[in-house]
Amino acid sequence: MKKPKTLAYHALKSIAQLEQVSDFHCVEGWSVADIKWEGFRFSEIVRLVKPEAQAAHVVFHSFGKTGSAPGGQDHYVESLPLSELLDPKREIMLVLNMNNNPLPEDHGAPLRLISPYDLGYKSIKYITRIEFAKEARPGWWTLANPIYPAVARVPKDRLRKR
């Protein structure tokens, strides 16, 4: 993106919202079924900001400082390939509402990513900045806990058939 763009909360709310019901799967082995999310696909951000052609990955930055700074990261960061964010089969959304209510603070308000086929730490909460990048960047969880891989698919035996 040649020129950074700031999108206020009301601008995000003005994007055509869609609803999606999906499950959330934590890396610790627990899941929550049938969460109703309301938000928009990442393609809406791409449409608004028109990233540079060489952007292959997206880095999400989270609000607040962490107690440690692995790899020099003092706040939560997560990275996903742009191609996955744009793939409708992955059902990835930026969400503002959860179960018919504004997204609660403990679930990532004002804005969080939902990536239902990835483990929960890829669904970064408290998003304050979105950066388009040429290369992937390791997330905070992967740097702090090398047992957490950068690619974190939910094991097939934990996915329900719909």
Feature roles, as predicted:
Residues 1-37:
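A glycine-rich, hydrophobic loop/mini-helix early in the fold
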Residues 38-41, 45:
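Stable alpha-helical elements in mature extracytoplasmic
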Residues 48-162:
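Extended, aromatic/histidine-rich regions of cofactor-dependent oxidoreductases associated
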Residues 11, 28, 39, 62-64, ...:
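A mature extracytoplasmic/lumenal domain signature
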Residues 6-8, 41, 81:
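Short, solvent-exposed coil/turn linker segments
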Residues 1, 10-11, 22, 41, ...:
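A compositional/structural signature for long, glycine/proline-rich flexible linkers
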